[in-house]
């Protein structure tokens, strides 16, 4: 990367640059790539099979399969489409949420403000106002039909079921409107027993510890071309 930058490129092509690295080194290098993206302003074409890398670094995605383009659009939109989960990974399906650091509490948590409220995650060494993109996996979201009390889960967001889609033989994917799009994956039995239907108001529950550092990345500055 250093040698490439010395030539003052107009565009950088990174083809699986982190494939041979362990998780700790990947996270470190991704931080450097984020800073390159934001400080130098050089467009980067980033090729990878690792969804966590792409969702952390990219603002625009082109999804390829069998030699052709399956979908193209913003990373937020692509990750919000359940029909693409066979390509993006059913186990990793979820939503991307653009947030800003609102502050830090006395218990080692960072508060990330977004349209739907405040998302509390494990502490980040970032200043207030820093833009952060959070990836919330559908399997990490639970549903309640009434606001819960005496609960260890800190992230509780009121919202409405926008869509419901069967996912495999026993699961149901719910698209929730909590001010932004959020996905929840629950069992079809739970959906039936709770009487869930599109339009119903519910509460989305997200454990803070389910959102690890690999699910968070510095968002691209909004005014870049």
Language-model segments: what does each one mean?
Residues 20-21, 36:
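Short coil-to-helix N-cap segments within the nucleotide-binding domains
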Residues 12-16:
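Catalytic Walker B motif of ABC-type/P-loop ATPase nucleotide-binding domains
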């Amino acid at each position: 990367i250093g040698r490439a930058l010395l030539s003052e490129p107009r565009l950088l092509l990174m083809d699986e640059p982190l494939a041979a690295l362990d998780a700790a080194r990947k996270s470190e290098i991704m931080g450097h790539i984020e800073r390159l993206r934001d400080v130098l302003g050089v467009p980067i074409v980033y090729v990878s099979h690792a969804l966590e890398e792409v969702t952390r670094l990219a603002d625009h995605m082109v999804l390829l399969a069998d030699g052709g383009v399956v979908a193209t659009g913003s990373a937020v939109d692509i990750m919000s489409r359940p029909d693409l989960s066979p390509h993006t990974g059913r186990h990793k399906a979820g939503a991307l949420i653009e947030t800003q650091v609102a502050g830090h509490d006395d218990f080692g948590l960072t508060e990330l403000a977004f349209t739907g409220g405040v998302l509390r995650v494990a502490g980040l060494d970032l200043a207030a106002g820093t833009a952060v993109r959070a990836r919330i996996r559908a399997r990490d979201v639970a549903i309640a039909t009434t606001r819960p009390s005496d609960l260890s889960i800190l992230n509780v967001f009121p919202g409405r079921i926008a869509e419901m889609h069967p996912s495999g033989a026993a699961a149901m994917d719910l698209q929730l409107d909590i001010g932004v799009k959020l996905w929840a994956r629950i069992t079809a039995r739970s959906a039936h027993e709770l009487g869930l239907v599109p339009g119903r108001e519910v509460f989305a529950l997200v454990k803070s510890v389910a959102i690890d550092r690999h699910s968070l990345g510095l968002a691209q500055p909004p005014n870049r071309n």
